[in-house]
């Protein structure tokens, strides 16, 4: 009951969200805070349709996009929608790890003239896989200032992948968790083919210690409005480890 009450309060907090992009059923854009927007795109993985979430920030210099739409068929529709809504172009793109639902748009955004970024670790993985890479790379942690907006990229440790990072917007107290943070309605850890499950718990604790005053967490997939996602991720890791022990 306590968790249900918490979810009801959180749901009420999201009732004022503005939704855009409904003309394309595979792209949904929702205003979260001031100039910060959550965008959700849909794609199919192993026969099941999933939602992928990320954010973009509108600054006085242009638009900063974290990650990318999931599937290149959505790239142009996405940037067209941004320009239609805000009258600004994408000037920066940052990938939070090497998978296509995060780094898949690096080449597209680069061709638009945006500065593209990833960590050196992500860049190394993309190079080995012969995939398009960011123009600029950085070590695991980096602070950015774009016009009137500041944000921070933080590497908490291994989890969903070796290279997963999160992005923190301090003014809005919004954490973009990417795929290291599971949605509150996730039934399991999802794709773990490149995961480090035994390191994942500590990495989540590192996030909690680094950003103790988070107001909103945007999970990488499915329902991002359920703000129990951090604790739920820890629960899912524990459940997985217990099942592994029981099967050995």
Curated annotation (Swiss-Prot):
Primary enzyme class: hydrolase
EC number: 3.5.2.6
Chief location category: periplasm
Cross-referenced SMART domains: Lactamase_B
Residues that coordinate or bind substrate: 182
Annotated keywords: Antibiotic resistance, Hydrolase, Metal-binding, Periplasm, Signal, Zinc
Obligatory cofactor(s): Zn(2+)
Localization per record: Periplasm
Signal sequence interval, chain numbering: 1-21
GO biological process, alphabetically ordered: antibiotic catabolic process; response to antibiotic
Keyword Metal-binding: yes
Gene Ontology MF terms in the entry: beta-lactamase activity; zinc ion binding
Details of cofactor binding: Binds 2 Zn(2+) ions per subunit.
Function: Confers resistance to the different beta-lactams antibiotics (penicillin, cephalosporin and carbapenem) via the hydrolysis of the beta-lactam ring.
Subunit structure: Monomer.
Family note: Belongs to the metallo-beta-lactamase superfamily. Class-B beta-lactamase family.
Protein name: Metallo-beta-lactamase type 2
Organism, as annotated: Elizabethkingia meningoseptica
Taxonomic lineage from the root: Bacteria, Pseudomonadati, Bacteroidota, Flavobacteriia, Flavobacteriales
């Amino acid at each position: 009951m306590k968790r249900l009450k918490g979810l009801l309060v959180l749901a009420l907090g999201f009732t004022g969200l503005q939704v855009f992009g409904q003309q394309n059923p595979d792209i949904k854009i929702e205003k979260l805070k001031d100039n910060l927007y959550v965008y959700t795109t849909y794609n199919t993985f192993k026969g099941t349709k999933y939602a992928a979430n990320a954010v973009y920030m509108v600054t006085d210099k242009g638009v900063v996009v974290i990650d990318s739409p999931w599937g290149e068929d959505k790239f142009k529709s996405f940037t067209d929608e941004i320009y239609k809504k805000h009258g600004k172009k994408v000037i920066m793109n940052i990938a939070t790890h090497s998978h296509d639902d995060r780094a898949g748009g690096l080449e597209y955004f680069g061709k638009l003239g945006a500065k593209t970024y990833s960590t050196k670790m992500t860049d190394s993985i993309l190079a080995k896989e012969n995939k398009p890479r960011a123009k600029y790379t950085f070590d695991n942690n980096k602070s950015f200032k774009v016009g009137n907006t500041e944000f921070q990229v933080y590497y908490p440790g291994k989890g969903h992948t070796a290279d997963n990072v999160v992005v923190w917007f301090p003014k809005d107290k919004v954490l973009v968790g990417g795929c290291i943070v599971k949605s509150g309605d996730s039934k399991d850890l999802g794709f773990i083919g490149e995961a480090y499950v035994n390191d994942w718990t500590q990495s989540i604790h590192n996030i909690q210690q680094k950003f103790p005053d988070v107001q909103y967490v945007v999970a990488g997939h499915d329902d991002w409005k359920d703000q129990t996602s951090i604790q739920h991720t820890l629960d899912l890791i524990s459940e997985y480890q217990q099942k592994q022990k029981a099967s050995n």
